[in-house]
Amino acid sequence: MNLNSIPAFQDNYIWVLTNDEGRCVIVDPGEAAPVLKAIAEHKWMPEAIFLTHHHHDHVGGVKELLQHFPQMTVYGPAETQDKGATHLVGDGDTIRVLGEKFTLFATPGHTLGHVCYFSHPYLFCGDTLFSGGCGRLFEGTPSQMYQSLMKINSLPDDTLICCAHEYTLANIKFALSILPHDSFINEYYRKVKELRVKKQMTLPVILKNERKINLFLRTEDIDLINEINKETILQQPEARFAWLRSKKDTF
């Protein structure tokens, strides 16, 4: 399997997973034009679309792509039924695409019906987890999002996090505003800044490293707890997550 990315809009990535025969699955095509261009250039043969949630920048290109490739199966949660999904999927489902098995798990928070697709080592997590951050809570609660992130955090160390936006630099700046002396985050910031100056992408990221730079995955880390305790004493990891999310919302 080969992982490819297509830039879209200002900071979206549309992921395309291909096999050796050129058959492919397209993840969250927010617009059709760049996908159609890439398909023509690489001579890919689209077999399926994965949708993680219903937001327009993730589903906007589905119907046009289906006009060109009506044989495609479009997998998505119930909230994407009116966005072009032909096969509804949910927590615990498994599907076979490109000869590979993908496991789905519900990750409510950003939206209530958000799902992720996992076939080791690839995790397509939409707007649940970003490198250095997590999605805004447009529909769900902090508790829901925390539990969703813990599902992701339980995956193997070598999982490749394929999130949908290039938010890494801004997220690392936020992390440093909370833990300014964290050596790993500081070093990672320098690397990410250099990549972005060169207009290179920072994704995908390996989960083992993400656990070190993403404060939303470090709610039981003593350094973070000590920093939060300077402002307020929060006993539960979920409460510390909610505190972080509130801080990020106004950062």
From Swiss-Prot:
GO terms for molecular function: hydroxyacylglutathione hydrolase activity; metal ion binding. Zn(2+) 2 binds at residues 57-58, 127, 165. Monomer. The gene is gloB. Binds 2 Zn(2+) ions per subunit. Its EC number is 3.1.2.6. One of its GO terms (biological process) is methylglyoxal catabolic process to D-lactate via S-lactoyl-glutathione. Belongs to the metallo-beta-lactamase superfamily. Glyoxalase II family. Pfam families: HAGH_C (PF16123), Lactamase_B (PF00753). It is an enzyme of class 3 (hydrolase). This is Hydroxyacylglutathione hydrolase. Keywords: Hydrolase, Metal-binding, Zinc. The keyword NADP does not apply. The keyword Zinc applies. InterPro entries: Clx_II_MBL, Glyoxalase_II_hydrolase, HAGH_C, Hydroxyacylglutathione_Hdrlase, Metallo-B-lactamas, RibonucZ/Hydroxyglut_hydro. Zn(2+) 1 binds at residues 53, 55, 110, 127. Its cofactor is Zn(2+). It catalyses: an S-(2-hydroxyacyl)glutathione + H2O = a 2-hydroxy carboxylate + glutathione + H(+). Pathway: Secondary metabolite metabolism; methylglyoxal degradation; (R)-lactate from methylglyoxal: step 2/2. SMART domains: Lactamase_B. NCBIfam families: GSH_gloB (TIGR03413), PRK10241.1 (NF007597). Thiolesterase that catalyzes the hydrolysis of S-D-lactoyl-glutathione to form glutathione and D-lactic acid.
